[in-house]
C-alpha cells in the first residue's frame, strides 16, 4: 500500500510541475522568418499564406505553395501585400 501511495504522490508532483513549467498564456512561435525570398513568386504558385507570430524577431509572411513548400516574404514589399489581399478575397 505504501508503494502505491508513494507512486501516486510522485506522479501528482510530476503533473503539477509540468503544468507550472510554462507561464499561462505562453504561445511560443511555431515558425519565424529569418530571411526573405529575394524575388517575387509567381502568384500561380501560391495556394495560401499566414503571418508569423508576433513573438518572432522579424515580421514575415509565409506563403504556402501549391506543392506544399513554405516561403518567407517581407510583408513590407508591395507584391506581398497584393498577394495577401488577393488570397483574402478568394
From Swiss-Prot:
Cystines in this chain: 32-56, 33-72
Compartments (UniProt record): Secreted
Keyword tags: Chemotaxis, Cytokine, Disulfide bond, Secreted, Signal
GO MF entries: CCR chemokine receptor binding; chemokine activity
Main location: secreted
Pfam families registered for this protein in UniProt: IL8
Signal peptide: 1-21
Any one annotated GO CC term: extracellular space
GO biological process terms, semicolon-separated: antimicrobial humoral immune response mediated by antimicrobial peptide; chemokine-mediated signaling pathway; eosinophil chemotaxis; inflammatory response; positive regulation of cell migration
InterPro entries linked to this entry: Chemokine_b/g/d (IPR039809), Chemokine_CC_CS (IPR000827), Chemokine_IL8-like_dom (IPR001811), Interleukin_8-like_sf (IPR036048)
Function: Monokine with inflammatory and chemokinetic properties.
Complexes and interactors: Homodimer.
Family classification: Belongs to the intercrine beta (chemokine CC) family.
Protein name: C-C motif chemokine 4 homolog
Organism: Gallus gallus
Highest classification ranks of the organism: Eukaryota, Metazoa, Chordata, Craniata, Vertebrata
